[in-house]
C-alpha cells in the first residue's frame, strides 16, 4: 500500500480521538442517525406529563388578559419564569391546538433538540475537540428525555445558551449579549454564564463597551417585561425570585446530606460563598490571562472606564472554556438541581473534562458516572454524591491544569 493510500485510509481510532480528525464521520452525518432514533422515541416511549399542562394553563390566562404574574396560575402553581417563556409557550400554544396536540409538541421539541445538538457539534468543531466528545453528547438518555418526553422550557433555554456561546466564540458580541438575555428570559439559569462573560468583555472590548453590553442585556429584559408593567413588582419578584425555596423531595444533587442541613440558611450561605470564591479563583488564575488583571483591577476599570492592558488575543477555545466553566461552577454550587436542569450543562461537561487534561478513558468514565447519577429516579445518596463529585473533580482539575490548546 502506498504512503498516500495509508494517509487517506479510514482509521476509526484516529477519527474518534484526534483533534479535528472527523473525516467522513462528521457531526452533521451523525445527526442524521438521530432522526429515526427520535421518531422511535416519540412512537414507542410514553410521554410523561409534568409541567406542560401547567404551562398551557398559564398561557391561557395570559391570552385571556391576565397580566399579574401572581394570578397566572397553573396546576403546579403560579408562573415563575420570565416573559420570554410566556411568549415562547404562547407560540407553542397556537402550534399545538391549545396545548392538546402533545405529539406535535414532541416533534417541535425534537427539532429544538436536533438544532441544539448541531450547534454544539459545530462548537466542538471550532475548538477542535476530539470526535468522541460529540459521540458522548448524542448518547445521553437524559437529554433526549428532557426535550422529547418532558417538554421542559430548559430545552429552549439550552438552545439560546448554545447560540450565545457560539456567537461569543465568533466574537459577535452584540448578538451574544442579546442571545444571553433571551436565554435568561426563558429561564434565569443562563445568568450562570454572566461572571465569565463580563470578565471576557472587559478584557477584550474595554469597560465602556462592557457597560454598553450590560445595558443591552437589561434592555432586552425590559422589552420582555412590557406586557406586565402594570404589575411591575409582581413580575420581577416572581420571574427572578432568587430566594425561592426548594423541596428536598426533588433534589438530584444534595440527597446525601440530611434534610435539616439542606433546608438550613447556613447551608445556602455556605454554597453561595463557595460559588463566589470559585469565580474569583478562576478569574485570578485562568480568565484574566488576556490582561493579567486582578478582580480589584477589573472592578476599578469598570468604575474609572480605564481599559486593562491587552497581553494576548482570546481564542474560541479560551472563550468556550471560560463560559462553560462559569456555568459548571454555578451547577456545582446550586441550591438544588432538578432532573430537567441537566440540560443546563450536560452539553459541555465532557468537553470540560477533556480541557482539564483527563485522558479519554477518564473523560468517558466521568461522563458515564454523570449519566448514571442523572438517570436514577428518585435520587439516592449515592447518585446525588456522584452528581456533585463529577463537576467538583472537573472544576478542581480545570483549576490546577493549563487549558489544552487546539
Curated annotation (Swiss-Prot):
Protein name, UniProt field: Dol-P-Man:Man(5)GlcNAc(2)-PP-Dol alpha-1,3-mannosyltransferase
Domain of life: Eukaryota
EC number: 2.4.1.258
GO CC annotation terms, alphabetical: endoplasmic reticulum; lumenal side of endoplasmic reticulum membrane
A Pfam entry, by short name: ALG3
EC class: transferase
Family the entry assigns: Belongs to the glycosyltransferase ALG3 family.
Function: Dol-P-Man:Man(5)GlcNAc(2)-PP-Dol alpha-1,3-mannosyltransferase that operates in the biosynthetic pathway of dolichol-linked oligosaccharides, the glycan precursors employed in protein asparagine (N)-glycosylation. The assembly of dolichol-linked oligosaccharides begins on the cytosolic side of the endoplasmic reticulum membrane and finishes in its lumen. The sequential addition of sugars to dolichol pyrophosphate produces dolichol-linked oligosaccharides containing fourteen sugars, including two GlcNAcs, nine mannoses and three glucoses.
Known catalytic reactions: an alpha-D-Man-(1->2)-alpha-D-Man-(1->2)-alpha-D-Man-(1->3)-[alpha-D-Man-(1->6)]-beta-D-Man-(1->4)-beta-D-GlcNAc-(1->4)-alpha-D-GlcNAc-diphospho-di-trans,poly-cis-dolichol + a di-trans,poly-cis-dolichyl beta-D-mannosyl phosphate = an alpha-D-Man-(1->2)-alpha-D-Man-(1->2)-alpha-D-Man-(1->3)-[alpha-D-Man-(1->3)-alpha-D-Man-(1->6)]-beta-D-Man-(1->4)-beta-D-GlcNAc-(1->4)-alpha-D-GlcNAc-diphospho-di-trans,poly-cis-dolichol + a di-trans,poly-cis-dolichyl phosphate + H(+)
Record keywords, A-Z: Endoplasmic reticulum, Glycosyltransferase, Membrane, Transferase, Transmembrane, Transmembrane helix
Pathway the protein acts in: Protein modification; protein glycosylation
Membrane topology: Multi-pass membrane protein
Chief site of localization: endoplasmic reticulum
GO biological process: dolichol-linked oligosaccharide biosynthetic process; protein glycosylation; protein N-linked glycosylation via asparagine
Source organism of this protein record: Schizosaccharomyces pombe (strain 972 / ATCC 24843)
Amino acid at each position: 500500500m502506498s504512503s498516500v493510500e495509508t494517509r487517506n485510509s479510514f482509521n476509526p481510532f484516529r477519527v474518534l480521538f484526534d483533534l479535528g480528525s472527523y473525516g467522513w464521520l462528521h457531526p452533521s452525518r451523525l445527526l442524521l442517525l438521530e432522526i429515526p432514533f427520535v421518531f422511535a422515541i416519540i412512537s414507542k416511549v410514553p410521554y410523561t406529563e409534568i409541567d406542560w399542562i401547567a404551562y398551557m394553563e398559564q398561557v391561557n390566562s395570559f391570552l385571556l388578559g391576565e397580566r399579574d404574574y401572581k394570578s397566572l396560575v397553573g396546576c403546579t402553581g403560579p408562573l415563575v419564569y420570565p416573559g420570554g417563556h410566556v411568549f415562547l409557550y404562547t407560540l407553542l400554544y397556537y402550534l399545538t391546538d391549545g396545548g392538546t396536540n402533545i405529539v406535535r409538541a414532541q416533534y417541535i421539541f425534537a427539532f429544538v433538540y436536533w438544532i441544539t445538538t448541531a450547534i454544539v457539534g459545530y462548537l466542538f468543531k471550532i475548538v477542535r475537540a476530539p470526535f468522541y466528545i460529540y459521540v458522548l453528547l448524542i448518547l445521553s438518555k437524559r437529554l433526549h428525555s428532557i426535550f422529547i418526553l418532558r417538554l421542559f422550557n430548559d430545552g429552549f433555554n439550552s438552545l439560546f445558551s448554545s447560540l450565545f456561546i457560539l456567537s461569543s466564540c465568533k466574537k459577535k458580541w452584540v448578538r451574544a449579549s442579546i442571545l444571553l438575555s433571551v436565554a435568561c428570559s426563558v429561564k434565569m439559569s443562563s445568568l450562570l454564564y454572566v461572571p465569565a462573560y463580563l470578565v471576557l468583555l472587559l478584557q477584550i472590548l474595554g469597560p465602556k463597551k462592557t457597560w454598553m453590553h450590560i445595558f443591552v442585556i437589561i434592555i432586552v429584559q425590559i422589552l420582555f417585561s412590557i406586557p406586565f408593567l402594570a404589575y411591575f413588582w409582581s413580575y420581577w419578584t416572581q420571574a427572578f425570585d432568587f430566594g425561592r425555596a426548594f423541596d428536598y423531595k426533588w433534589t438530584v444533587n444534595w440527597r446525601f446530606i440530611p434534610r435539616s442541613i439542606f433546608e438550613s440558611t447556613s447551608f445556602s450561605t455556605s454554597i453561595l460563598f463557595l460559588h463566589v470564591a470559585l469565580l474569583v479563583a478562576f478569574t485570578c488564575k485562568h480568565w484574566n490571562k488576556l490582561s493579567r488583571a486582578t478582580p480589584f483591577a477589573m472592578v476599578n476599570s469598570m468604575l474609572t472606564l480605564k481599559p486593562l492592558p491587552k497581553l494576548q488575543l482570546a481564542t474560541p477555545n479560551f472563550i468556550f472554556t471560560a463560559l462553560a466553566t462559569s456555568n459548571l461552577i454555578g451547577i456545582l454550587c446550586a441550591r438544588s438541581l432538578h432532573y430537567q436542569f441537566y440540560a443546563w450543562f450536560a452539553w459541555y461537561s465532557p468537553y470540560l473534562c477533556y480541557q482539564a487534561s483527563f485522558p479519554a478513558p477518564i473523560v468517558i468514565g466521568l461522563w458515564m458516572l454523570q449519566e448514571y447519577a442523572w438517570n436514577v429516579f428518585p435520587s439516592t445518596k449515592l447518585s446525588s454524591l456522584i452528581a456533585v463529585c463529577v463537576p467538583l473533580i472537573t472544576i478542581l482539575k480545570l483549576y490546577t491544569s493549563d487549558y489544552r490548546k487546539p
